[in-house]
């Protein structure tokens, strides 16, 4: 058995599958790492470590200390009325949400605001695979190099995640449209713009997605958020 176990994305450790592993190995020392310890289901992550928090650093402090880059957040108005979109288990019904978001008028607002900035390494979060495909198609038709990255059945504009990241880094791609596949386990410091093109019910998911662009990189002084 292992005496020392380190678990990244430790907020998942309250799940039964993680608990079974921890119980099986019974480590003498367990170290959990997470940027989002709070959970929407109110399960207590800290309990697993007997409330022994070795080090805590909040987002604002990490930026102030220079560990992460600051960000400029630009709110963009569109007339999408989310109050009329039905919800299922606290989330918007995907088909109805797509109808509201996948319209050319809204895509034109997005591209118009995107072009105001000189950022060339952008990650854009969409509501679904269809939405990501729609946005990638619209941007490609307007001469902006982009692709869509998501799990499941692949569409016309879809690309493998690693291939898309390589393309973004070397300048072959300007924008990656995705859903949730970039929330965790991805380290691309070069990202200098994040676009939220979807409503996000979870503050945890929002912070995870925002965090994709906060890593420091050469010639990167800040992150632009739309």
Identify the role of each PLM range.
Residues 203-208, 212-226:
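Conserved segment of the helicase C-terminal RecA-like domain
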Residues 1:
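Inter-Walker segment of RecA-like/P-loop motor cores
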Residues 7-14, 39-40, 185, 203, ...:
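Catalytic P-loop NTPase motifs of RecA-like helicase/translocase cores
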């Amino acid at each position: 058995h292992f005496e020392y176990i380190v678990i990244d994305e430790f907020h998942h450790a309250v799940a039964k599958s993680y608990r079974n592993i921890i119980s099986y190995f019974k480590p003498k020392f367990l170290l959990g790492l997470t940027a989002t310890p709070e959970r929407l289901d109110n399960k207590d992550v800290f309990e697993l470590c007997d409330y022994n928090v070795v080090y805590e650093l909040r987002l604002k402090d990490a930026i102030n200390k220079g560990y992460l880059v600051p960000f400029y957040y630009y709110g963009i108005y569109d007339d999408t009325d989310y109050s009329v979109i039905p919800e299922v288990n606290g989330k918007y019904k995907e088909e109805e949400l797509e109808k509201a978001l996948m319209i050319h008028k809204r895509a034109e607002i997005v591209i118009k605001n995107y072009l105001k900035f000189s950022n060339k390494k952008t990650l854009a979060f969409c509501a679904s695979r269809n939405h990501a495909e729609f946005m990638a198609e619209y941007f490609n038709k307007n001469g902006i190099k982009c692709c869509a990255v998501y799990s499941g059945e692949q569409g016309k504009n879809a690309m493998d995640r690693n291939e898309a990241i390589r393309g973004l880094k070397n300048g072959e791609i300007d924008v990656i449209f995705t859903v949730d596949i970039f929330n965790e386990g991805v380290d691309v410091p070069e990202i200098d713009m994040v676009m939220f093109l979807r409503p996000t019910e979870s503050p945890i998911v929002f912070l995870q997605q925002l965090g994709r662009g906060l890593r420091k990189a050469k010639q990167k002084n800040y992150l632009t958020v739309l």
